[in-house]
């Protein structure tokens, strides 16, 4: 019977670990976000910041697997050196 218990144990461990992290983030991030909102009172400034943020987030996409495998293969060849 240990197999059905494993997901439940993992879930409870994760919730116990993540809850304090979420509280800590909320305590520190909310005042910063409120201060930022006060500074960004103009609509143009908010839109400019949002567009920059969306651009940065769109650039952090993981490479597709085909591209990564080609890079791994070439790096492996460089590490191994010339074949005899």
UniProtKB/Swiss-Prot annotation:
<comment type="subunit">
    <text>Interacts with MYMK.</text>
</comment>
<dbReference type="GO" id="GO:0000139">
    <property type="term" value="C:Golgi membrane"/>
</dbReference>
<keyword id="KW-0812">Transmembrane</keyword>
<dbReference type="GO" id="GO:0045026">
    <property type="term" value="P:plasma membrane fusion"/>
</dbReference>
<comment type="similarity">
    <text>Belongs to the MYMX family.</text>
</comment>
<keyword id="KW-0472">Membrane</keyword>
<dbReference type="GO" id="GO:0005789">
    <property type="term" value="C:endoplasmic reticulum membrane"/>
</dbReference>
<dbReference type="GO" id="GO:0014905">
    <property type="term" value="P:myoblast fusion involved in skeletal muscle regeneration"/>
</dbReference>
<dbReference type="GO" id="GO:0007520">
    <property type="term" value="P:myoblast fusion"/>
</dbReference>
<feature type="short sequence motif" description="AxLyCxL">
    <location>
        <begin position="48"/>
        <end position="57"/>
    </location>
</feature>
<dbReference type="Pfam" id="PF21950">
    <property type="entry name" value="MINION"/>
</dbReference>
<feature type="compositionally biased region" description="Basic and acidic residues">
    <location>
        <begin position="67"/>
        <end position="84"/>
    </location>
</feature>
<feature type="topological domain" description="Extracellular">
    <location>
        <begin position="26"/>
        <end position="84"/>
    </location>
</feature>
<feature type="region of interest" description="Disordered">
    <location>
        <begin position="60"/>
        <end position="84"/>
    </location>
</feature>
<dbReference type="InterPro" id="IPR039014">
    <property type="entry name" value="Myomixer"/>
</dbReference>
<feature type="transmembrane region" description="Helical">
    <location>
        <begin position="5"/>
        <end position="25"/>
    </location>
</feature>
<dbReference type="GO" id="GO:0043403">
    <property type="term" value="P:skeletal muscle tissue regeneration"/>
</dbReference>
<dbReference type="GO" id="GO:0005886">
    <property type="term" value="C:plasma membrane"/>
</dbReference>
<keyword id="KW-0517">Myogenesis</keyword>
<comment type="function">
    <text>Myoblast-specific protein that mediates myoblast fusion, an essential step for the formation of multi-nucleated muscle fibers. Involved in membrane fusion downstream of the lipid mixing step mediated by MYMK. Acts by generating membrane stresses via its extracellular C-terminus, leading to drive fusion pore formation. Acts independently of MYMK. Involved in skeletal muscle regeneration in response to injury by mediating the fusion of satellite cells, a population of muscle stem cells, with injured myofibers.</text>
</comment>
<keyword id="KW-1133">Transmembrane helix</keyword>
<keyword id="KW-1003">Cell membrane</keyword>
<dbReference type="GO" id="GO:0060538">
    <property type="term" value="P:skeletal muscle organ development"/>
</dbReference>
<protein>
    <recommendedName>
        <fullName>Protein myomixer</fullName>
    </recommendedName>
</protein>
<feature type="topological domain" description="Cytoplasmic">
    <location>
        <begin position="1"/>
        <end position="4"/>
    </location>
</feature>
């Amino acid at each position: 019977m240990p197999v059905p218990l494993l997901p439940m144990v993992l879930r409870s461990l994760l919730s116990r670990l993540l809850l304090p992290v979420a509280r800590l983030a909320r305590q520190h991030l909310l005042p910063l976000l409120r201060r930022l909102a006060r500074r960004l009172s103009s609509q143009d400034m908010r839109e400019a910041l949002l567009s920059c943020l969306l651009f940065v987030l769109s650039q952090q996409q993981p490479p597709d697997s085909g591209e990564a495998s080609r890079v791994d293969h070439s790096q492996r060849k460089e590490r191994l050196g010339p074949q005899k």
